[in-house]
Amino acid sequence: MGLLTPIQLPRLDELGAVHFIAIGGSGMNGIASMMLAHGIPVSGSDRQDSKYLRSLEAQGARVYVGHRADQLGDASTVVASSAIREDNPELAEARRRGLRVLHRSAALGSLMLGRRGIAVAGTHGKTTTTAMIAHVLSGCGLDPSFVIGGALTGTATGGHLGSGDIVVVEADESDGSFLQYPREVAVVTNIDPDHLSNWGSADNYADGFLRFATADSVRLLVTSADDPGAVVLTERIRQRAAAGLPVPEIMTFGTSRDADVRIVGADLAGTGSRFELRWDDDAGPV
């Protein structure tokens, strides 16, 4: 399941019936839900029953508890994450039959094709930030599609197929697969060395975020002016710009006086907060 560039990602109409291994997982059920909304036949299995399996079944998916080779049915494409071992009976059967096997991030990338992608990465806060962006865009009447690594409050899914041309996704950096998402806007909440067993070193981990933020498709980077790792990322990109290399526009946020969008007077109480946002010569309460 090697990484694919956006130009290599299969189109949805090329996938046929899709089977998800570990379909109830936080990174999988939203993708499966969006594929169902596109009219793609979906099946999948997980080690144990859950509200996510029941929700997907109600949406039209065939779901199974436990992994068995015969559950692939007529699938043409099998989706798995990095956590699925090669000796998984369903993955082994897919290999034996020569089926297309996609990493979950490639399946998500295919869902993003033809839409304006906003990909949210960072060591901490990805799920919350992705949900907030999707909520704000929905409130503006843009009806974005979204895939989030967790269920929205009051639902059993993290995926939604909207009528608008924007798609907002949570971009998991743990295995480097966030680099293959087609994206116009890259959001980096913070950078704190993590998943070093996959990346090898803190420097490699930081370099991954640099590649994420400076891909040819990225027109805008939104990142923190407070987080030390994000500040270093911004500095590295500005150095690239000074050297004449193409870089995205950068918009920073935070409490720092250097932030393009500044948070002032934050009052945190219970599960809510109030603060003022200041940008350019404008300001407004939130």
Where are these regions (language model features)?
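Intrinsically disordered, low-complexity segments enriched in polar/charged residues with Gly/Pro
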Residues: 5-7, 145-147, 253, 261-264
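Adenine nucleotide phosphate-binding catalytic loops in nucleotide-utilizing enzymes
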Residues: 14-17, 21, 56, 81, ...
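Glycine-centered flexibility motif
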Residues: 16, 44, 66, 149-150, ...
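Phosphate-binding loop of NTP-binding sites
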Residues: 20, 34-37, 57-58, 71, ...
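Short linear motifs in intrinsically disordered
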Residues: 45-46, 150-156, 259-269
